[in-house]
Amino acid sequence: HKWHIKNKAVFEDVGQWKRPWYFKKDESETMYQAVQRESKQTRLTAGILDGSTLGKIEIKGKDALEFMNLMYTNAFTKMKPMTSRYALMLGEDGMIMDDGIVCKINDKHFIVTTTSSGAPKVLAHMEEFLQTEWPHLQVYLNSITEQFTTFNISGPKSRDIISKVFTNVDFTNAAFPFMTFKTLDYKNTRARIMRASFTGELGYEIYISPQHALELWELIFQYGKKFNLVPYGTETMHLLRAEKGYVVIGQETDGTVTPIDINFNWMIGKNKKDFIGKRSLKRKDTAREGRKQLVGIIPLNKSQFIEEGQHILECENLPSKITTPVSYLGHVSSSYHSPNLNHCISMAMIKGGNKLMGKKLFVSTSKGTKNIPVEIVNPVFIDPDNKRLVS
């Protein structure tokens, strides 16, 4: 925290935490300028985020595998030890509750991450079902959020930097593929490195005890200096993930969104007998046509900016005085100016959105009655083939 203050971080509240929102290069730099700079440099060389606030929960016991299969939509039975998997947790109503990464050490030992603000809720959710529905399972839960500092380093030069720091680790693609992790000794303490990314670039997450965190953070910057490694905050994190089409729980989701609504069908274990929310996914309303679905939108006039929260409409203009309800198709959930594409990119939840690709629609604006013409596109704006992720 002191390093962030020293390096001109501006903070925002995230759950119970103060997180760096963005870093000012100098006093005259605006938030917009800082975020554009951080985003561009991360994709050009490398950037690093303090992700320590992510919730971390340890699951142990002889029935840990069965418990995990019940808690998440994903299947973990065939998952190999020392691999990771992006996972989705639903409520009993079948709506998305939280997401995170599941690390499988073995069938009796898992570590999961949660959203920063969702950690207490997820742990309580797990405890409730363990105590009231499955008391026969021998499983033990432990919150380890504050036991590990987490760094997320990503960008095409991230491997070059991190290999200088951990010289005893082989970071080649063959030895350290995407969505695997390693544990190692680092200066008489245990560290964990996972190859994962929330930016869409080559990336790694480093977990280490808080006592060694500052020393390691500064060492990473020492080796990253030649690559102009930049620290970035939560706003740049959100912009970079939007370019890649990654969702944020609570932004693309609002308690009424299912995995199918955001094109996450692939995250539902097809052969699983049961998991929390499975029955609700088969309800008539949950499976009906015309539900809001996640899409990307770009303005036809690339100089225009789309505001978050605005409505998606079929009409080009609104009357100066609205006397009857205006039919709308959905809303804008995320919107940023992409410095890497040089125009505004937005994500939206639109009724039947997957069938509207390429269609021209309109987005309302707070600046008048003339709506912004947009095109409905795939929400993945950068690297749709994942070549950067697995490079």
Go through the PLM ranges and name each one.
Residues H1-D13, R19-T30, N106-K108, T113-S391:
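Conserved, structured C-terminal
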Residues H1-L90, M95:
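Acidic, proline/glycine-enriched N-terminal capping motif
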Residues R43, D99-G100, M194:
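Short beta-strand/turn micro-motifs at beta-sheet edges
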Residues D50, D99, E205:
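Acidic active-site catalytic centers that drive phospho-/nucleotidyl reactions
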Residues G55, A87, G100-I101, K182, ...:
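Residue-level detector of beta-strand structural context in well-folded domains
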Residues A75-F129:
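Well-ordered mid-protein domain cores that form the structural environment of catalytic cofactors
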